[in-house]
Amino acid sequence: MMPAKLQLDVLRTLQSSARHGTQTLKNSNFLERFHKDRIVFCLPFFPALFLVPVQKVLQHLCLRFTQVAPYFIIQLFDLPSRHAENLAPLLASCRIQYTNCFSSSSNGQVPSIISLYLRVDLSPFYAKIFQISYRVPMIWLDVFQVFFVFLVISQHSLHS
């Protein structure tokens, strides 16, 4: 069990405004909803590719959450591979895992983003997701995500 003081530190860290942007928490009672040993961050696909200074974000997370490493696995999604490769040793040292749904698949098709978002959003296995918006209104991130998922579904429908 994580010590109460460390829980408060994590709470303050997640609720505070980072120098590199704004963390949007969808659930203020998230401390009661941590699942086992996992904190999940989801960098929405659109800003992760075009708007977010990903390297600064990861360095910030690593510095902030090193003390939490014995208690949680911090998991990142939608991390462009160039950032993951550059920061692999730093991520590993802080037990930060990443999943890159943009990596090129062997058959050359666009990797399915649908399964990733459904698994992250709906599966009880994962903890509450904290979306890091970085000066982009969350409503627009949601619109981009819905549009992209719709686009992928349409492409799958056309080819099936």
From Swiss-Prot:
It is a multi-pass membrane protein. The chain crosses the membrane at residues 39-59, 136-156. Its main location: membrane. GO terms for cellular component: membrane. The keyword Iron-sulfur does not apply. Belongs to the UPF0479 family. This is Putative UPF0479 protein YLR466C-A.
